[in-house]
Amino acid sequence: MTKLNLTHIEECMDDYDLFLFDLWGVIIEGGETYPGVVEALNKIIAKKEVIFLSNAPRPDFIVARNLRNWGVLDATPPMVITSGDVARQLIVDYRKSSLNDQIPKIFHLGSDRNDDILLEIDYLAINNINEADILLLSVFRDEHEDIHEFDEFLKGKIL
């Protein structure tokens, strides 16, 4: 792989047709975009194909809206691929292939801020994990949180 000696990404715009950007840690950190990133993205989007990648449990339309709110003016859902989109598609596929198109019963273990992963999907939210067709995990724990928080809850559950 060739090492690029760039001071600004715009210097290599003519060398590539497609730009893939991870969001967290590349475009944004701690709720703030990095300096100069929005301006550079808008210039690249005007001339090249751009795809944004994220491990966020969010639908593409939510992330595209966030990008526009940050100033990335032409961000659209087809430009975004998230782990949330993958999960959403798997739920839809499972409903068709394994549930005879019946509405899936989903037990979602995750924080309230991740509830948008299920926006615009027909499902039944249930509180009993043993009755679930699908166990959706979108919980996040950083190094300051207890990773064993759910051990007791999950003990003895049918998984």
Give the ranges of each region predicted by the language model.
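HAD-like aspartate-dependent phosphatase fold
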Residues: 1-159
